[in-house]
Each structure stands twice: as structure tokens, then as C-alpha cells.
Amino acid sequence: MSQFSFTKMHGLGNSYIYVNMFEEHIPEEELALVAEKVSNRNTGIGADGMILICPSEVAPVKMRMFNNDGSEGKSCGNGLRCVAKYAYEHKLVEETIFTIETLAGIVTAEVTVENDIVTLVKIDMGAPRLTRAELPMLGEGETPFIREDFLFHNQRYAFTAVSMGNPHAVIFVDDVEKAPLTTLGPVLENHEMFPERVNVEFIEILNETEMNFRVWERGSGVTQACGTGACASVVAAILNGKMERGKEITVHLAGGDLMITWTEEGTVMMKGPAEVICHGVYEYKIEA
């Protein structure tokens, strides 16, 4: 029987099991299965996935994120905020502004601290990636993939493709509560045009600075929030002429609000909370 200590945290209800790999060890070949086991809401701790907080050669810490199906993702906005909170509160970093390595690149985090507790985290998510090769998405062309039709159950849905280190297909609808989240979501996620699958967002524009948001996450299904998805959705709204670049946009997710800005300089800034749920020790056994 193997075991490791963990902290369960969430960003707007998007929960992960966080493991401090400065102190714990899980064999590389077991990571995918352990992520699937610990995330199981019936037989494990229950979460949207598992995130490892690891040593890095290029930043104070490195984040590795696994979905609840065991697949590894390249980035996670809500996860980054929680990693930033954990790193500061557990003294893995000393400054309030520091970098985090991800498989999608290095991002900068800034934490707001009150009485040694991180109350708010701002992440510089970098510039959006808009070409097919960067998403990745099948086909050729260097122009952004904006408002292209997709036929589903005899109804056309137009989506815009944006990568924030992981791929997103953003669809604008009149009412997110009536969007085909659990039907169109998995179909588009697994469509052959996306060789690494895709996250699917449904967006309802409320006004110039607010939107409602629902998400079907690649490898996890319906979740309460998706930070990179919120960033991608704001970028898509601006590309479609629905919002203005440089303005702070409030994204209303099922789990709460994020503030997103696509700056004139090109990077996307995400601001929001991160919360600790509990600490514990998880025991598991890998069947031979």
C-alpha cells in the first residue's frame, strides 16, 4: 500500500487534489492511474483532477495537471491560482510576485496577502494562440478560426477556437442555461478536427463588460469553473467584436466570478480567488 499527503483546494468550485512533490513521491508510471483513482467521487477523495506542485529548474515551482480521466493537461487557470496560494503560504516562495512553470510555458503570479493568507491571485496567462497549429487543430492557415459553423442535431453552432496553453472552442448563445452543454460538449471535445481534444465553452454576453459562462472540460466533463476557458472566452468575444480589448471583463462562472483582461500589450490577465478545502493522507494500491 502506498500513500501521500495532499491538500484539496478549489478555484470557484473547480477542485483538484494538490500534492507537494517537494516532499512527496509518486512514481511517474503511476501518475495517470493515481490521478484517476484519487479524483473518483465514489471511491477516492473526489475532484476534477490532481495537480502536482513540483521543483523546477526555470521557476520557483512547476505545476503538472492531470484530469480526472488520468490525461495530463498543459495548463489550468484555476489550478495556477491555487498553486500560487499554496506556494506562498507553504513558503516555497518568499516574494508576492513569482513565476510558475507549466507544460504550456512560464506564467507570472501575483498574490494579495492579508495576515499571511493569500486572499486573491492574479495570473499573467500570456498571449492567446490563435492559429490551427498552435491550438492544435487540423487544417492549414495562419488566420484566427473565428465563428466557424458546426452542425449538430440539424442546428448550426458557430465556434471560435482559442488556445491559452490548452485548446478551447467558444460558442456564443442567447442563454447558457439552455445550451447543449452535456450533448454538444462531448461531441465537439472528441471531434477529429482536434487531435488533442478540446474544451468547450458556451457564452452569453450580458453587456460590454460581463458574460455568463458554462464549460465542458476536456477529460473532466462539466465543471464549476475553468480559468483558461474564461480567458479564451474573453479573447473570443473581442475577436468577434462583442467586447473591447483592454477592458476588465467579469466572467460569471457557475462557481463564481473571474476578472479577465486582454491587454493592449497582448497578454491575458486573470484575477480571482483560491481556497483550501481540506488536508489529508491518501492511501492507494496499484493492482499488478
Curated annotation (Swiss-Prot):
Residues the entry annotates as binding substrate: 14, 67, 77-78, 166, 199, 217-218, 227-228
Record's subcellular location: Cytoplasm
Pathway(s) the chain acts in: Amino-acid biosynthesis; L-lysine biosynthesis via DAP pathway; DL-2,6-diaminopimelate from LL-2,6-diaminopimelate: step 1/1
Chief location category: cytoplasm
Sorted UniProt keywords: Amino-acid biosynthesis, Cytoplasm, Isomerase, Lysine biosynthesis
Pfam families the record matches: DAP_epimerase
Class of enzymatic activity (EC top level): isomerase
PROSITE patterns recorded: DAP_EPIMERASE (PS01326)
Record-marked site positions (Could be important to modulate the pK values of the two catalytic cysteine residues): 168, 217
SUPFAM superfamilies, A to Z: Diaminopimelate epimerase-like
InterPro entries given in the database record: DAP_epimerase_AS, DAP_epimerase_DapF
Active site residues of this protein: 76 (proton donor), 226 (proton acceptor)
Assigned EC number: 5.1.1.7
GO molecular function: diaminopimelate epimerase activity
Catalytic activity field: (2S,6S)-2,6-diaminopimelate = meso-2,6-diaminopimelate
GO cellular component: cytosol
GO aspect biological process, one term: lysine biosynthetic process via diaminopimelate
UniProt record similarity statement: Belongs to the diaminopimelate epimerase family.
Assembly mode: Homodimer.
Function, in words: Catalyzes the stereoinversion of LL-2,6-diaminopimelate (L,L-DAP) to meso-diaminopimelate (meso-DAP), a precursor of L-lysine and an essential component of the bacterial peptidoglycan.
The name this protein goes by in its record: Diaminopimelate epimerase
Organism in which the protein naturally occurs: Bacillus cytotoxicus (strain DSM 22905 / CIP 110041 / 391-98 / NVH 391-98)
